[in-house]
C-alpha cells in the first residue's frame, strides 16, 4: 500500500513539473506568411437617371397652405379618431362649446385671415397610403364651410423680456357639434384652404411637430351633472381634448425640368428620385474577398447644400417601364443594406459596403441598381443636384482577398 502511494506521488509531481514548464514557455507562430492581399478596386463608370413620383410629404413636421417660391399647397387635411366621443353620448353631459385649433410659429399672421375650414363625414385620405396626386382634385362643394378663424398670439411674459411662443388659429365648430359627437359618425375630416387667386401662405405645425401641446386638435368644453336629483345634483365643468390622428398637406406636383445631360436631382417636395447603375457583381472581386470599405463619392457643381441627407436603397428589380413620371414609386426597395449620408462641401460620400459584400456572398442577390432619395429629415423645400459627368465621381473599394 505504501509503495502504491509513493508511486502515485511521484507521478503527480512529474505532471505538475511538466505542466508548469509548458505554461512558462510562450508559443511563437510566424503570421507573416499568411497570403492575404489588401487591394483597391476603383470604379468610375457610374450612370443614372431621374424619375418622378407623387411627392411623399406625409410625416413632415409642418403643414402648408398657399404658395411659397415655386411650390403651391392646395390644402391641408386632417382626420380625427372615431373612438374618442363616447363621453358626450350621455344624457348627463351637455356640450357648451367646441373648437378646432391649429398652431403656427409665424407671429405675423393677421386677424381674420382668409384661411377657410371645411368639414366632411367622408373618408378622404389615409396619411400612410394616399397619394398626393389623388388628393389634388378633392371638390369642396359638398363640404360644410365653417369659415375663417380667430387669431391669438401667445406671448410669454414670465420674464422681464416678453417672448413670442406661438400663434393660435381657432374655429368655432359649434354648428357641427351634433354630427361630430355622434358615435355613428365614422369619419371626421377637416380641410384648410385658401380662396382661388389668393397669394397668402400659411405654415402650421403638424402632429409630428410636438408631443401633443401644439398638435392640431378639437377642444370640447362641457358640463356633467352628478346625482339623480336635479335640485341637489352637482355640475362639473370639464374640458376634453381630441388630438388629430392624421394630417397631410396637398401639393401641386412640379414636373422636373430638363436637368442637363447626365445630372440627377433629388427633392422631396418635387418627388424627384434617381436610379444609379454601378457595374459591380459577384465576379468583380476575387472569390472569398472581404470588403473593408466601399464608398461612393458624387460631386456637384456650384454651391454645396451642406447637411442635405440622401438615402440609398438597393433595388429588388427594375420595372419594365419606359416612363419617368409615376403616381406611386414602381422601384421596389430590397428592404436591406440601405444607408444614408449628408452632403458636405459639394460632395456626397455614402457607404455601399454592406450591400456589395452581400452581393459577393449571396448567389441569389444581383445588383440591379441603387435608388437615391431625399431623407425625411430634410427641409421639404430643399433639393440637391449631382453631376454624373464630374471627373471626381468614383466608387472606391478596399478589400482583402485570400
Predicted feature residues:
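Secreted, disulfide-rich extracellular signaling modules
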Residues: 2-6, 12, 19-402
Amino acid at each position: 500500500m505504501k509503495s502504491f502511494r509513493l508511486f502515485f506521488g511521484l507521478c503527480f509531481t512529474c505532471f505538475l513539473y511538466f505542466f508548469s514548464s509548458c505554461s512558462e514557455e510562450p508559443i511563437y507562430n510566424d503570421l507573416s506568411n499568411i497570403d492575404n492581399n489588401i487591394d483597391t478596386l476603383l470604379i468610375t463608370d457610374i450612370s443614372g437617371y431621374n424619375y418622378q413620383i407623387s411627392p411623399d410629404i406625409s410625416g413632415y413636421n409642418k403643414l402648408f397652405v398657399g404658395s411659397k417660391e415655386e411650390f403651391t399647397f392646395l390644402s391641408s387635411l386632417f382626420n380625427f379618431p372615431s373612438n374618442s366621443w363616447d363621453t358626450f353620448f350621455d344624457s348627463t353631459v351637455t356640450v357648451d362649446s367646441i373648437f378646432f385649433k391649429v398652431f403656427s410659429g409665424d407671429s405675423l399672421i393677421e386677424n381674420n385671415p382668409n384661411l377657410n375650414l371645411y368639414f366632411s363625414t367622408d373618408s378622404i385620405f389615409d396619411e400612410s397610403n394616399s397619394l398626393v396626386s389623388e388628393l389634388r382634385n378633392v371638390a369642396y362643394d359638398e363640404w360644410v364651410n365653417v369659415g375663417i378663424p380667430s387669431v391669438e398670439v401667445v406671448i410669454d411674459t414670465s420674464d422681464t423680456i416678453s417672448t413670442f411662443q406661438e400663434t393660435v388659429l381657432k374655429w368655432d365648430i359649434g354648428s357641427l357639434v351634433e354630427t361630430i359627437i355622434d358615435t355613428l359618425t365614422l369619419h371626421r375630416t377637416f380641410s384648410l384652404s385658401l380662396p382661388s387667386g389668393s397669394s397668402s401662405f400659411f405654415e402650421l405645425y403638424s402632429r409630428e411637430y410636438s408631443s401633443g401641446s401644439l398638435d392640431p386638435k378639437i377642444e370640447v368644453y362641457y358640463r356633467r351633472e352628478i346625482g339623480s336629483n336635479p335640485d341637489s345634483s352637482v355640475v362639473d365643468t370639464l374640458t376634453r381634448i381630441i388630438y388629430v390622428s392624421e394630417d397631410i398637406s396637398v401639393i401641386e406636383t412640379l414636373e422636373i425640368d430638363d436637368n442637363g445631360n447626365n445630372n440627377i436631382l433629388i427633392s422631396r417636395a418635387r418627388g424627384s428620385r434617381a436610379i444609379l447603375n454601378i457595374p459591380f457583381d459577384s465576379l468583380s472581386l476575387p472569390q472569398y474577398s472581404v470588403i473593408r470599405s466601399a464608398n461612393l463619392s458624387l460631386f456637384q457643381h456650384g454651391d454645396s447644400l451642406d447637411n442635405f441627407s440622401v438615402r440609398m436603397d438597393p433595388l429588388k428589380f427594375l420595372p419594365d417601364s419606359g416612363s419617368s413620371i409615376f403616381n406611386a414609386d414602381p422601384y421596389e426597395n430590397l428592404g436591406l443594406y440601405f444607408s444614408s449620408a449628408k452632403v458636405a462641401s459639394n460632395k456626397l460620400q455614402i457607404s455601399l459596403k454592406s450591400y456589395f459584400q452581400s452581393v459577393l456572398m449571396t448567389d441569389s442577390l444581383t445588383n440591379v441598381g441603387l435608388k437615391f432619395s431625399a431623407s425625411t429629415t430634410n427641409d421639404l423645400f430643399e433639393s440637391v443636384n449631382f453631376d454624373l459627368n464630374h471627373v471626381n465621381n468614383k466608387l472606391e473599394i478596399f478589400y482583402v482577398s485570400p
